[in-house]
């Protein structure tokens, strides 16, 4: 049982000034006698979400064996106001973190599934197309309602990005995941893998820098989401430079995708594609940079409130997590100023409550 708490301020997204209490770890709008007032005034935002990160992957794309280091990644996210993580693939079993109530909620996708030698070494479960359906079922049962495919990667025999899976295999794999009660998402940088993935009924696209006008329209019609990870897309020029000598076609592709990335995000949003904020933290990107991603979404063309929603109430709803409502688990971040008016406010949380306990 947690101690009763009291907060007051402007509750977002409704933008209504309210008194909010926390009783037994859950929100209530009924006065709780004896509750300690832990925050008065300011703006109350449903706990932030990093909708694409990798807990347990360290610098250089290697698995972290040390539990304290893995725990620190979660703490770094929490310090940024992120109270829920969508882990889009990790070779490390991070279930031990669920036993620590002061750490963010984690919604897992199991391990990446890739074709042989078509992803970062040792991170993915690598299978031939004939074994994809079985691998998807395994990861669906290991995750928390998501499966992560690698949709494209550099094919060294061709010297450029190319799809990893035949369309008919993708259709069977997505159907299998849905039978298991899981949604499916896929890493894609380029364009060629996207028609097969969308045709298979995939639920989300990660990065999506190769989206075209027709593919955006198809995503909007299907309700397929995109998590652009613009913080990671900033690395594309470096990827191109690193591959220039051996794979000039790949380098050219990555530069083109980088150049169009902002316009792609803007087009997706304007077409009605659900857009969510994810940093791709883990590996080469530090955890705790969600404010950078929200700012990047706004720079790309999302209105400030939409960019904020992509990392808060909209993302929580997408993942089945409640906001500030009667009976909901109390996850809230308080800011001194309105984050809708100044997105950089996200860098300065005043108070954080996670599962009904003050953690910052």
Question: PLM features: what roles do these ranges have?
Answer:
Residues 25, 41, 49-52, 81, ...:
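Divalent metal-coordination and catalytic microenvironments
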Residues 59-62, 194-200, 232-245, 261-263, ...:
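Histidine/acidic-residue-rich catalytic or RNA/ligand-binding cores of hydrolases
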Residues 179, 258-338:
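His/Asp/Glu-enriched, well-ordered alpha-helical/loop segment
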Residues 33, 130-226, 242-243, 255-275, ...:
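Histidine/acidic residue-rich metal-binding segments in metalloenzymes
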Residues 55-67, 116-126, 156-163, 238, ...:
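Acidic/histidine-rich helix-loop elements
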Residues 42-101, 117-122, 200:
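Metal-associated gating/positioning segment near the N- to mid-region
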């Amino acid at each position: 049982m947690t101690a009763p708490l009291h907060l007051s301020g402007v509750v977002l997204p409704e933008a209504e000034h309210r008194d909010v209490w926390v009783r037994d770890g859950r929100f209530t709008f009924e006065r709780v006698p004896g509750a300690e007032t832990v925050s008065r005034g300011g703006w109350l935002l449903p706990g932030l979400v990093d909708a694409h990160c990798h807990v347990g992957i360290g610098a250089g794309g290697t698995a972290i064996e040390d539990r304290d280091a893995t725990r620190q990644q979660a703490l770094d996210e929490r310090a940024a106001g992120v109270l829920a993580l969508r882990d889009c693939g990790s070779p490390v079993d991070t279930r031990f973190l669920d036993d620590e109530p002061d750490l963010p909620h984690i919604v897992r996708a199991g391990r990446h599934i890739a074709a042989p030698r078509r992803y970062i070494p040792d991170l993915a479960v690598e299978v031939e197309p004939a074994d994809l359906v079985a691998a998807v079922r395994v990861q669906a049962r290991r995750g928390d309602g998501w499966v992560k495919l690698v949709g494209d990667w550099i094919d060294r025999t061709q010297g450029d990005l190319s799809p990893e899976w035949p369309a008919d295999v993708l259709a069977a794999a997505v159907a299998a995941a849905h039978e298991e009660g899981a949604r499916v998402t896929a890493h894609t940088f380029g364009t060629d893998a996207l028609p097969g993935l969308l045709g298979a009924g995939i639920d989300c696209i990660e990065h999506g820098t190769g989206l075209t006008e027709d593919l955006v329209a198809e995503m909007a019609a299907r309700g397929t989401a995109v998590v652009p990870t613009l913080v990671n897309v900033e690395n594309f020029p470096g990827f191109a430079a690193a591959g220039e000598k051996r794979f000039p076609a790949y380098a050219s592709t990555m530069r083109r995708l980088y150049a169009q990335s902002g316009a792609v995000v803007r087009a997706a949003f304007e077409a009605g594609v659900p857009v969510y904020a994810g940093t791709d933290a883990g590996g080469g990107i530090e955890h705790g940079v969600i404010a950078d991603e929200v700012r990047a979404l706004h720079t790309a063309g999302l209105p400030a409130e939409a960019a904020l929603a992509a990392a808060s109430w909209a993302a929580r709803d997408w993942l089945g997590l409640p906001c500030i409502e009667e009976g909901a688990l109390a996850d809230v971040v308080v800011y001194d100023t309105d984050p809708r008016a100044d997105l950089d406010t996200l860098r300065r949380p005043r108070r954080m409550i996670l599962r009904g306990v003050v953690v910052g």
